[in-house]
């Protein structure tokens, strides 16, 4: 995992329902906790593009349902600004399931992946079909 440059806009608070964009068997996950989040007292933790978080599988195959998993955000609806001034926003909030070490659990990713997530997680960039 590499560091992320600049100010990050975190658009996914605790409890957010997120589409799972890989072929692991999970279809929808709910955000439980954000890894390495250092916030302010009584502020609800939130995740942004490229952040690793802990989630619960809400919809999916019977083996995957109600499991606690690690995931990385690859798309978010909330617009954010890149250092070159462009604003980026996606149609949905999406994540891919990973191991606690950052290895991707699936073998393919559906839809585009944000450049910030691809730069931070080389394993995600390796299997991404589109990087925006």
From Swiss-Prot:
Keywords: Ribonucleoprotein, Ribosomal protein, RNA-binding, rRNA-binding
PROSITE patterns: RIBOSOMAL_L14
Signal peptide annotation: none
InterPro entries referenced in this protein's UniProt entry, alphabetically: Ribosomal_uL14, Ribosomal_uL14_arc, Ribosomal_uL14_CS, Ribosomal_uL14_sf
SUPFAM superfamilies the record matches: Ribosomal protein L14
Assembly and binders: Part of the 50S ribosomal subunit. Forms a cluster with proteins L3 and L24e, part of which may contact the 16S rRNA in 2 intersubunit bridges.
GO biological process, one term: translation
SMART domains on file: Ribosomal_L14 (SM01374)
Name of the featured protein: Large ribosomal subunit protein uL14
Gene Ontology CC annotations of this record: cytosolic large ribosomal subunit
Any one Gene Ontology molecular-function term assigned to this protein's record: structural constituent of ribosome
Matching Pfam families: Ribosomal_L14 (PF00238)
Sequence similarity: Belongs to the universal ribosomal protein uL14 family.
Disulphide-bonded residues: none
UniProt xrefs under PANTHER family: 50S/60S RIBOSOMAL PROTEIN L14/L23 (PTHR11761), LARGE RIBOSOMAL SUBUNIT PROTEIN UL14 (PTHR11761:SF8)
């Amino acid at each position: 995992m590499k560091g992320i440059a600049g100010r990050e806009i975190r658009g996914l608070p605790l409890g957010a329902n997120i589409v799972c964009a890989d072929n692991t068997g999970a279809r929808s996950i709910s955000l439980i906790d954000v890894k390495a989040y250092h916030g302010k007292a009584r502020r609800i933790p939130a995740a942004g593009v490229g952040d690793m978080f802990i989630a619960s599988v809400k919809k999916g195959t019977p083996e995957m349902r109600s499991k606690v998993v690690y995931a990385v955000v690859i798309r978010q609806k909330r617009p954010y600004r890149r250092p070159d001034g462009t604003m980026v926003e996606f149609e949905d909030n999406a994540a891919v399931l990973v191991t606690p070490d950052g290895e991707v659990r699936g073998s393919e990713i559906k839809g585009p992946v944000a450049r910030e997530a691809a730069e931070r997680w080389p394993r995600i960039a390796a299997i991404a079909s589109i990087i925006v």
